[in-house]
Amino acid sequence: AFVVFSTGQKGPSGGASNWGPGFLPSEHQGVMFRSVGDPVLYLSNPKGVDEQIQRDSLHAIKRLNQKHLDVVGDPEIAARINAYELAQRMQLAAPEVMDLSKENEATLKDYGCQPGDGSFASNCLLARRLVEQGVRYVQLFDWGWDFHGTGPGEDIRDGLTNRCKKMDP
């Protein structure tokens, strides 16, 4: 799996192409995690859909996609099947891995973060936890290192000083 976090007022220049698969099959693209709330949209089941209904639905979708793959042979269909399976695994594992409230105080202090603050520091800690759980690649974007003096506190002297304080409290 390939997971992406982004913090700051804007996303990275280049948008989703930064974690897209490029010339590789789409199974190699990254999954953007949000810094606040459910890490992935629709991670939680909607009201009225329990785990069994979801499992049955995903199993039916997989069977249909597999039949289509057998007929057409398009590798994008195989990538779609893998994406659904990854989504289901994330839905089961992500809530626990992404919950920093159970992290000990010393670790939170070392990283300079608080559960739910959506900071770059929290994303670094989440990245570590994901890697510990077997995620092979985590990409972190942090907007706010561009100091061209375009606004208050955005010149190199003040902007860089303030930014470094956030990185190394």
Describe these PLM feature segments:
Residues 1-169:
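Ligand-binding pockets and gating/stacking loops
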